[in-house]
């Protein structure tokens, strides 16, 4: 397997009409999601060269996930630019990243222009409307190798300057294969994504979903302040697996959200990123 795009291609062939990724506004089947990513990739081809960085300055939603894969179709690697960071910190990151282009959206375009005055910008809405150039995409993918970079995440910059950590396709493939085999994920899995996309932990949700032909629901952030509604969301979406920070799990217990409603489909509960309090 040369890159993680093979996960998407394979699942789109197996489950074209199945829900792939959803947020609180939109939902994409595998066929729709694959087409969208190919359109984004086609739109990026004239703006980039293979193995260049592309910044992603978007809200946390299903379209952002599509942007990640569209960037891969263009042979590039992505870096999520946290929209809540101060402008100075984002400019530091952009200076280090040196992206060929930054993908944003019409709603954030004025803000992006102010923060990244010297970086080329393109709106996702523009890319999504492009015709798919199947021949050009195939040409780029024919030259792809598994050690190509997939994404770069930047540290918090506690030493004064954010540092980028570059991760290859092979690293994500190896981890995803182990993750899915160890915990026996399959196409019946329904993930509820909690972690932000600028954290490595989100990689598990995204790529396990695409690898298995499963479904990933991006949980609205507001629900993590409304534990009873969060539990209801888990039932409404028939979530089978969560991999959250302990503070999110503890909130459900501490506010006695389970007294009113219990998760009915949940089978796998995992935690990451924080120590689980002993009393829990």
Which residues does each predicted region cover?
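Carrier-protein-dependent adenylate-forming modules in NRPS/ANL systems
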Residues: 1-170, 184, 213
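Short gly/Ser/Thr-rich phosphate-binding loop of adenylate-forming enzymes
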Residues: 105, 224-229, 246-260, 268-280
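Short, Asp-centered acidic motifs that coordinate Mg2+ and/or phosphate
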Residues: 100-101, 190, 240-241, 268
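Residue-level signal for well-ordered alpha-helical positions
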Residues: 115, 178-179, 255-256
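Conserved AMP-binding/adenylation subdomain of ANL enzymes
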Residues: 163-192, 200-240
